[in-house]
Amino acid sequence: MIEMFSNPQFWISVLQIIAIDLLLSGDNAVVIALACRNLPVEQRKKGVLFGVAGAIFLRVILTFFAVSLLTLPYIKLVGAVLLLWIGIKLLIPEEEHHGTNIKADTHLWGAVKTIIIADFVMSLDNVIGVAGAAKGNFGLLIFGLLISIPMIVWSSQFILKLMDRYPVIIIMGGALLGFVAGEMLMTDTVVKGWAEAQPHWVHWAVPALGGLMVAITGKWLAARQVVAKKAITLVDQKVSGSSEKKTKRSAK
């Protein structure tokens, strides 16, 4: 146990778990707020606490299963691809916020149920990321979750504001997911033998390339989305303008 805590790699992995948890739990915090917004004031705190407790329980179970599955051949390769996709998706602005369709309940247990179900569905990306950062170490997984969960509950709104103010945080977060994806790829049982025969720098280069790929691809797709939106707006303006001219001519 003492050796584990004195290992620098342990603390690097803990920081990765905390960062991934905080990064991918911003929407979950909004869901909690939306689900409890119609509760009586005196029940809101209970709704948040009970909902978060249930969501945490489900998330821990999901993560344990994910860590167990990651010991099987090809699973880490699939997980790495999923993490790359999650990281890229994180950098692309969404049309609507995930939480806008969350139904607010006026009853305590209805709100709790909404929080648990929504968190379960929205935490799949979180689970894959945390399981990858834990590298099959259950002790590390528990330690990381115990630290990050209270931080999520109390500081996720603050982090959301920071992300709005400093978008570079989102890019760094996406790159982190790409880095973890690269690490997962290098430790899959199928490529482990090949990876161990490579120079030490390769073990850092592959994760670094994963992070770089996510950052570049995500920003490129986001830029394309902005250009496409501007083009659609211009077309709409031209169509509406020509319609107005036709209406005026017919009126004359």
PLM ranges: what are they?
Residues 1-252:
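Multi-pass alpha-helical transmembrane bundle typical of ion/small-solute transporters
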